[in-house]
Regions:
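Fungal secretory targeting signals
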Residues: 1-22
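Soluble FAD-dependent oxygen oxidases
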Residues: 19-626
Length: 626
């Protein structure tokens, strides 16, 4: 595994010199995308650890592969000399990871620091704190909870657990190519991390080499993108761009774009790969529908542009078929729309001496009966239903959102609903506000997200509109009520994936989204210091009791992979629907050696993480083929 000095010199040239000057057919690549590893450089270096893999070829013979990926301490694990040389080829972009909460523990000499620990404890629930770290996870339950903030530095030890051993802080395409080639040739587990937003912690893995795309922040405005059936404004963004950053860029151009509800979601990462729901979805469709072109590093290490005409199978798969599966997206070009007004409404109602539990649930049923009406008008609802005491419940709009609606138009839409609530004896005082744009509405109404806790487990269901029509609404409500009365928490969305002829909606977004008007997330929670037995019991109940009732009242529907249950039964059907066989074939075509793995991703059923606790599947074990 030794590298000759000539190899290092040649590969160092990749890190500092633009070796390829290619221009995409529609719009140009970012300058750092032209900094690529080439066959000539690999050949001149004689560095086999960084050589490309075989291009996609169904007839190519794949040699037998090791059953398991390496972990630190294995005899074949790269020596520190090799890691140092790898860092040289990257121009110093390699990071040896330290858990974010390590300053709170004495077993990290040189890192333990009371003042730094206080910062960790203060900011642990702040998503930006985790986004800016190369290895942290926003939802640490499946990391193994091996290094949580503590006030007692001697109480226990902090370990990496499910965090990656090393990360590459990507600033150019050659960084990704070198990382993929090194991981493939050295038999290392590979993970891809953008912001760390995923309920199943797809961006972590014990002993892994992580490709960290957070620094790819470029945004290019294309005023007249006229290519492959689309004609209009567009934005080309690096894969590190977050929702809030894209919204700000569109605001500066008096435009509207499709992005997430959470400010720190990475648009070109798992958001688009998972389909991407948005406050704009009821108007113009899913986030993945807006994609016009992508630039991607394939599992072979090759860098390609993917669109309707080039790699059409990947163009279909990358828009909804799941992240950490087909390659590493470096940038994406997205459709944009004219600036629109947005009117929002917030209110809450709860049980009281005048509102019985049955009346409360009648109010929830009333709202559900308007789901199709509201989404057909382009509206979107974000709400919470939770128990607040024995037989007591709260409903809270956070908010309802009327895209491309003035206040009078919005009030015309919602007044019949408010009247129906009043007729039940539920009097609410709605706070209705008209905003001039999506960005101002998003900033003014959506609460900041809270992350970092390991005290809950969530699952989700994509309910089709039939579930909220007279024949099935009572059955649906009963399944929801059962879970809430048993202690569950519901975060709901009244949303649809609107048809949109302006963009290409022939993609791999879960077909269940195209029929959905109710996307419901159900969570169970426990005390932060609960033992594994409590977490196991609650997680099992969520999956096999509460969610099973939801599956029974919505046969053939699905779940949203990015906010789904890591224990989802038959995840292939739930997260991918009828598209799974096609997606699996594309996966095997472009990644025959299984370089990319993530829990519940396409092809993940062929792998297992060893040493799992039932119902709490962490990523802190060895990854092996089944």
């Amino acid at each position: 595994m030794a590298l000759r000095s000539a190899a290092v010199a040649a590969l160092l040239g990749v890190a500092h010199t633009s070796l390829a000057q290619l221009t995409s057919t529609c719009g140009s690549r970012f300058p750092w995308e032209d900094n690529q590893l080439t066959d000539a450089v690999v050949a001149s270096s004689n560095a086999t650890l960084f050589g490309f893999g075989a291009d996609a070829d169904p007839s190519a013979k794949i040699l037998p592969q090791p059953r398991c990926k390496l972990l630190p301490g294995d005899p074949q694990w790269p020596s520190q000399t090799v890691w140092n040389l790898f860092n040289l080829t990257l121009g110093g972009a390699l990071i040896k990871n330290t858990p974010l909460a390590a300053p709170c523990y004495n077993n990290w000499p040189g890192v333990a620091n009371p003042a730094a620990c206080e910062t960790v404890r203060t900011r642990w629930n702040d998503p930006y704190f985790h986004v800016d770290d190369p290895s942290s996870a926003m939802f640490p339950l499946y990391q193994g909870r091996t290094c949580m903030p503590t006030e007692d530095p001697s109480a226990s030890n902090c370990t990496l657990g499910g965090y990656a051993s090393y990360s590459v802080a990507v600033t150019k395409v050659s960084h990704i190519q070198l990382a993929l080639n090194f991981a493939r040739n050295a038999n290392l587990r590979l993970v891809v991390r953008n912001t760390g937003h995923d309920f199943a912690d797809k961006s972590i893995g014990a002993g892994a080499l992580s490709v960290w795309t957070h620094k790819l922040k470029d945004i290019q405005f294309l005023s007249n993108y006229n290519c492959r059936g689309y004609n209009g404004p567009a934005f080309k963004i690096g894969s590190g761009v977050e929702t809030e950053e894209l919204y700000q860029a569109a605001e500066a151009r008096n435009l509207t774009v499709v992005g997430g509800e959470c400010r720190t979601v990475g648009i070109a990462g798992g958001y688009i790969a998972g389909g991407g729901h948005s406050p704009m979805s009821s108007l113009v469709g899913m986030g993945a529908d807006q994609v016009l072109s992508l630039d991607v590093v394939l599992p072979s290490g090759r860098f390609v542009t993917v669109n309707r005409d080039a790699y059409p199978d990947l163009f279909w798969a990358l828009r909804g078929g799941g992240g950490s599966t087909f390659g590493v997206v470096t940038s994406v070009t997205l459709a944009a729309y004219p600036k629109i007004p947005v009117t929002t409404m917030t209110f809450a109602f709860l049980t009281s001496p005048n509102v019985t539990a049955d009346t409360f649930w009648a109010g929830v049923r009333t709202y559900m009966s308007y789901f199709d009406t509201f989404t057909a008008a382009g509206a979107y609802g974000y709400f919470l239903v939770v128990g607040i005491g024995p037989g007591q419940y709260l409903f809270n709009f956070m908010p309802m959102w009327g895209g491309n609606m003035t206040r009078p138009q919005f009030e015309t839409l919602v007044n019949p609903f408010l009247t129906d609530l009043a007729n039940l004896g539920i009097d609410v005082t709605p706070n209705i506000t008209e905003y001039p744009s999506l960005y101002s509405a998003h900033s003014g109404t959506f609460p900041p997200e809270q992350v970092g806790a390991a005290d809950s487990h969530a699952a989700s269901r994509l309910f089709p509109k039939e579930n909220f029509q007279p024949a099935k609404i009572n059955e649906t409500l009963a399944a929801v009520r059962y879970a809430i009365e048993d202690g569950a928490i519901l975060i709901g969305y009244n949303i649809r994936s609107a048809p949109n002829p302006k963009v290409n909606q022939t993609n791999s977004v879960n077909p269940a989204w195209r029929k959905t008007t109710g996307f419901f997330i159900l969570a169970t929670a426990w005390a932060p210091d609960s033992p594994d037995s409590v977490i196991q019991s609650q997680s099992e109940k969520l999956t096999t009791d509460w969610m099973e009732r939801w599956r029974e009242v919505s046969p053939g529907a699905g779940s949203y992979m990015s906010e789904g249950d890591i224990n989802e039964p038959n995840f292939q059907q739930s997260f991918y629907g009828e598209y799974y066989p096609r997606l699996l074939a594309i996966k095997k075509k472009y990644d025959p050696r299984g370089l990319f793995y993530a829990p519940t991703a396409v092809g993940s059923e062929e792998w297992t993480v060893q040493g799992q606790v039932p119902w709490i599947p962490t990523q802190n074990g060895r990854l092996c083929r089944v």
